[in-house]
Each structure stands twice: as structure tokens, then as C-alpha cells.
């Protein structure tokens, strides 16, 4: 019996000690608002940086974001592999009735509360807990203490990073990789999203923003070679969502035309998805009035489509309004989110938006990757934002936490899928065999 228990201990130790994969350095880019067709085959001809990356690595047809196709929900989905109703970051604007605290797209101090962030553990926290060195640049949330942990370094987002900020972040990250100071570097860049909002997804301004990113990425491939990192660094580039055209003043739904705003306890967000908390005793009245409004759908929480993986979120409101593509919901026209244009006044019209049904074509994002663990010149089928996490865990050599991603959708892009498969705890089959053997 002593020999059996000794053998059992050895089996358990060996099974727990299996590595997740080869442990290489990982550089991650989150390019906000980058729609999948911005790098179509035709578009790549005028984007030498992206074209080189595609030829050297993997490009998926498109990436489907989580619902709602907004930034913060997908920032967390990408870094946890979990749907919004699981990680609890369900919007850019949230309200917790129990504490009367609000999350307002990261601009208020209450947005830094663990209340919003501790619903799941993002990859950068897992790596930091594993004694990996994590450097983050402008990444929303890196300044927050999550589950009692902060990354090694966080250059906090305060204003929209410039193209020079972006280039400097890339250069600095590569220097930290070269010196051995970093295991993971994550860089966030927003300008493509900003220009897409202000001028529209097909505008010259959005195209110029993309070309500026392309130039930096072209230099990046050269800098990797100069620092002799090409055999030890994987690079992954993805976006949180796409962008579609909107037409202000033509396709606006003003709630004050249908209901009394005094009958609402709270309203969060404007645009494709709006959250309403009716005042006590007003739920049915508001719901029935809004059911008749064209170009949008009003859902009671329990009736939200299951395919959105949204309704179980703890911060989801009693009523959720979802606009048809291109339509914009607001309390009234005066509260439309104008932006400060060249006049110095907040009077600029928004011409692009996102947040709509995540299955719509214009909401699709991108995923690119290259490096020693990825196939070269490989085109992959579409993936979903929940799938990205497992890829990052695999090439970083870390065991993924339980998640909603599909390994089968991403395994094709890796050179050695067997050694790159996410590590797991001992399987039920192995444990069952051990138990049967002990009882024999």
C-alpha cells in the first residue's frame, strides 16, 4: 500500500507540473474600433506594415465581439475569455443600485472600485501573480488594483494617446523585452476609434489614423530584428469591435417623446444600448410605452436573447433598449454626445458608432498574430472575442482560468498545437483510474 501511495503522489506531482507551453515573451496590441474590413486584401496593398505581418503570421477572417459591442465589456472579455454576464463588465456606463455607485467609462473615481473589476481575473493579473513581469501602456484598467494585485508597470491612460505616444510605447516595450525586464507588454491605441466616431469609418481621417499605426508596426518588425527578439517574442494584435455609420438628426430616438423621464430612477449610456431603471411602480407603464417605438427593441431583463450572454450580469438593468443598426437612442437631442471640433466648442456631430448587435458585419473586429509559435501566411476562420484569451495563455505558457472560449477555433493557427494546448489540471479519467487502482 505504501508503494501505491508513493506512486500516486508521483503521478499527481508530474501531472500538476506539466507546462502550459513554451514560455516566450508576448507583446499584445489592442487597437480600438478597428473594423475587420480596414485590412481587407485590397486595403493591405497600401498598408505595408500590416501586409508584412499578415505574410509572416496569422490573420483571421474576422473577430466577433461580445455583446454589447462596446469597449469596456470587450476589453475584459478579451483578457478573461469570459462573456460579459460572467465577468460582469457589461457596459461603458453602469450603475449599482445597492451602493448607488456608477461606472462612467473610467472618468469618475468610483470606476476604479473593485466592485466593477473583481468579477473575473484578467490575464495581466494572472501573470503578475505568477511572478511574471507585466508592462502596460495606456491599457484601460491597468491602473486599478484588481483582486489585490497591480501589474509591474502601468502607464495610465489619461488622454487619447498620440501617434508618437504609440511609437514610444512600442519601442520601450521592446527594450524591456531585450533587457529581460518584461514577460508581457500590452499596448492600447485609440486613435482609429476616435476618428471613426468623429468622421465616420470610411473617412479620410480614419484612413490617416490607420496609416499612422501601419507605419509604427512597420518599424516594429524592424526593431524586433535589430534587438534579436524574433525567436523569443510572439506578437498578437486585436480589436474590441468595429464601427458603423450613423446619421445624427435623421436617425435619433428621443425617449422624452414617449415617456416621462421623471418616471426613471436611472438612465445609463446613450446610443445603441441604453439601460433604464424605472421608478417604483413605473416598470410596466414604461415597458409598454417603449414597446411601440420603432427602430429599437426594449427587453425586460429575463427576455434578453440568450445569444447575447448578457442578461445574467449583476449590473444589467430591468429594461434594456437596443437600437437598430445606425440608430441612436438618447433622452433628448440636447443630450447627444457632441464632440469638441475645430471651433473649440462641443458641436461636432458623431458620424460613426458601435455597440449594436454583435453579429452585425460592421461590428466585426480583427485578430492578427506572428512569432515563433504561429504559422506563417495563414488565414484562419472567424473567431470570437472569448477565444483570444486561450491563445494568449498558450503562447505565454500560463494555465488559463475557466473561460467561455473555444480552443478548437484557434488551435489551427499554432505551429505545434500539441505542445501549445492550454494546460489543464489532471483529467477526471486519470483520477478515476488512480482511484480504481488504489481500490484494487
Swiss-Prot record:
Regulation of catalytic or functional activity: Inhibited by EDTA and EGTA in vitro.
Location of this chain's protein in the cell: Cell membrane
Propiece residue ranges: 420-440
Recorded topology in the membrane: Lipid-anchor; GPI-anchor
Superkingdom, taxonomy of origin: Eukaryota
Residue(s) carrying Phosphoserine: 71
SUPFAM superfamilies: Alkaline phosphatase-like
UniProt: Zn(2+) 1 binding residues: 32, 71, 240-241
UniProt keyword Protein biosynthesis present: no
GO BP annotations listed: choline metabolic process; lipid catabolic process; lipid metabolic process
Listed Pfam families: Phosphodiest
Disulfide bridge partners, by residue number: 142-154
Keywords, in A-Z order: Cell membrane, Disulfide bond, Glycoprotein, GPI-anchor, Hydrolase, Lipid degradation, Lipid metabolism, Lipoprotein, Membrane, Metal-binding, Phosphoprotein, Signal, Zinc
Record GO terms (molecular function): glycerophosphocholine cholinephosphodiesterase activity; glycerophosphodiester phosphodiesterase activity; metal ion binding; phosphoric diester hydrolase activity
Cofactor descriptive note: Binds 2 Zn(2+) ions per subunit.
Main location: membrane
Sites carrying sugar chains: 100, 118, 341, 404
Any one Gene Ontology cellular component term annotated for this protein: side of membrane
Subunit text: Homodimer; disulfide-linked. Homotetramer.
Membership in a protein family: Belongs to the nucleotide pyrophosphatase/phosphodiesterase family.
Name of the protein described by the UniProt record: Glycerophosphocholine cholinephosphodiesterase ENPP6
Chain's gene name: ENPP6
Amino acid at each position: 500500500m505504501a508503494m501505491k501511495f508513493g506512486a500516486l503522489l508521483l503521478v499527481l506531482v508530474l501531472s500538476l507540473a506539466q507546462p502550459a507551453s513554451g514560455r516566450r515573451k508576448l507583446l499584445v496590441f489592442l487597437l480600438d474600433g478597428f473594423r475587420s474590413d480596414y485590412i481587407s486584401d485590397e486595403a493591405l496593398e497600401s498598408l505595408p506594415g500590416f501586409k508584412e505581418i499578415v505574410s509572416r503570421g496569422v490573420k483571421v477572417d474576422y473577430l466577433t465581439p461580445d455583446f454589447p459591442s462596446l469597449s469596456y465589456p470587450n476589453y475584459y472579455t478579451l483578457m478573461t475569455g469570459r462573456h460579459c454576464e460572467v465577468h460582469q463588465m457589461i457596459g461603458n456606463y453602469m450603475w449599482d443600485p445597492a451602493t448607488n455607485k456608477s461606472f462612467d467609462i473610467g472618468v469618475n473615481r468610483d470606476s476604479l472600485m473593485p466592485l466593477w473589476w473583481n468579477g473575473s481575473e484578467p490575464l495581466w493579473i494572472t501573470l503578475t501573480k505568477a511572478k511574471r513581469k507585466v508592462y502596460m501602456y495606456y491599457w484601460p484598467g491597468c491602473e486599478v488594483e484588481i483582486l489585490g494585485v497591480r501589474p509591474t508597470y502601468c502607464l495610465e491612460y489619461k488622454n487619447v494617446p498620440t501617434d508618437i505616444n504609440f511609437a514610444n510605447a512600442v519601442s520601450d516595450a521592446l527594450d524591456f523585452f531585450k533587457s529581460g525586464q518584461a514577460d508581457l507588454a500590452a499596448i492600447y491605441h485609440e486613435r482609429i476609434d476616435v476618428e471613426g466616431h468623429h468622421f465616420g469609418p470610411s473617412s479620410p481621417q480614419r484612413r490617416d489614423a490607420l496609416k499612422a499605426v501601419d507605419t509604427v508596426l512597420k518599424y516594429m518588425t524592424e526593431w524586433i530584428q535589430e534587438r534579436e527578439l524574433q525567436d523569443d517574442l510572439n506578437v498578437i494584435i486585436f480589436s474590441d469591435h468595429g464601427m458603423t455609420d450613423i446619421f445624427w438628426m435623421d436617425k435619433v430616438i428621443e425617449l422624452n417623446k414617449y415617456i416621462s423621464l421623471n418616471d426613471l430612477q436611472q438612465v445609463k449610456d446613450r446610443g445603441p444600448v441604453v439601460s433604464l431603471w424605472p421608478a417604483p411602480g413605473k416598470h410596466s407603464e414604461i415597458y409598454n410605452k417603449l414597446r411601440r417605438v420603432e427602430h429599437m427593441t426594449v427587453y425586460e431583463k429575463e427576455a434578453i436573447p440568450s445569444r447575447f450572454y448578457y442578461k445574467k450580469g449583476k449590473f444589467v438593468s430591468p429594461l434594456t433598449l437596443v437600437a437598430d443598426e445606425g440608430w441612436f437612442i438618447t433622452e433628448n437631442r440636447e443630450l447627444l454626445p457632441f464632440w469638441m471640433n475645430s471651433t473649440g466648442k462641443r458641436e461636432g456631430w458623431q458620424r460613426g458608432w458601435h455597440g449594436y448587435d454583435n453579429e452585425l458585419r460592421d461590428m466585426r473586429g480583427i485578430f492578427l498574430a506572428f512569432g515563433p509559435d504561429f504559422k506563417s501566411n495563414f488565414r484562419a476562420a472567424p473567431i470570437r472575442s472569448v477565444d483570444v484569451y486561450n491563445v494568449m495563455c498558450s503562447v505565454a505558457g500560463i494555465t488559463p482560468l475557466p473561460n467561455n472560449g473555444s480552443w478548437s477555433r484557434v488551435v489551427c493557427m499554432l505551429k505545434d498545437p500539441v505542445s501549445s494546448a492550454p494546460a489543464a489540471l489532471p483529467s477526471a479519467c486519470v483520477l478515476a483510474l488512480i482511484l480504481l487502482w488504489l481500490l484494487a
